[in-house]
């Protein structure tokens, strides 16, 4: 059963990526959606691992959007000598998360959803959620939280490990950013505690 489950998980992730792109286009959400992702290897073995993984994805899942990137090409695509090859995924990418969330909220409101900002859910109930100051009744409830669920959903909280995440924001870097990552891909590396930018 495991190969079938793995294939279904793969299909769900590719469907989710396509859905985000479709929603952005259909709802005209201005969120700087940009295709292209690089996973930059930093250990000598990462280049060979990337080749093997890209071949596995191609052979097992028919994935034609992910390919291995040799070390010399990776150094040209990320202006750093630190990386030794890796992967490129042309179907993945990045966007401005706040602008995307605002666009989704606008689209939901236009479709008739009622949004309840600053209404922290303290308990999920069969017909909605209880907040610190009232109740929200709903046929469907979507649990979309960070890793700190506490009593909101004990079963999910026991399966999620919160992690530290640090982000620095600057004013737009313009040409300086284009000189560092000419293709404007999003990048993460293969460290255990990874860097991403």
What are these regions (language model features)?
Residues 2-107:
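Rossmann-like flavin
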Residues 18, 26-34, 121-123, 134-197:
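Active-site substrate-recognition segment that forms the wall
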Residues 51-53, 127-128, 153-155:
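Short acidic, glycine/serine/threonine-rich loops at helix termini
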Residues 60-61, 66-70, 94-97, 115-117, ...:
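Short, surface-exposed, polar/charged, turn-prone segments marking secondary-structure boundaries
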Residues 68-80, 113-128, 135:
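A conserved short coil-to-beta-strand element within the FAD-binding core of flavoproteins
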Residues 86-88, 129, 168, 197:
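Well-ordered beta-strand positions enriched in small/hydrophobic/aromatic, beta-favoring residues
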């Amino acid at each position: 059963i495991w190969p079938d489950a793995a294939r279904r998980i793969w299909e769900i992730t590719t469907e989710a990526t396509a859905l985000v792109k479709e929603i952005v286009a259909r709802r005209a959400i201005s969120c700087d959606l940009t295709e292209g992702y690089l996973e930059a290897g930093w250990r000598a073995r990462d280049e060979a691992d990337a080749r093997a993984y890209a071949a596995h994805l191609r052979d097992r899942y028919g994935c034609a959007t992910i390919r291995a990137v040799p070390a010399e090409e990776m150094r040209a695509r990320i202006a750093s000598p630190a990386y030794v090859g890796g992967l490129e995924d042309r179907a993945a990418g990045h966007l401005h998360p706040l602008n995307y969330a605002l666009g989704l909220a606008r689209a939901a409101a236009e479709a008739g959803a009622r949004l309840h900002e600053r209404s922290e859910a303290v308990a999920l109930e069969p017909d909605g959620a209880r907040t610190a100051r009232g109740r929200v009744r709903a046929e469907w409830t979507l649990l979309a939280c960070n890793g700190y669920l506490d009593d909101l959903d004990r079963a999910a909280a026991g399966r999620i490990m919160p992690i530290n995440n640090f982000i620095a924001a600057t004013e737009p870097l313009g040409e300086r950013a284009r000189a560092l990552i000419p293709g404007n891909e999003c990048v993460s590396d293969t460290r255990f505690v990874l860097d991403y930018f």
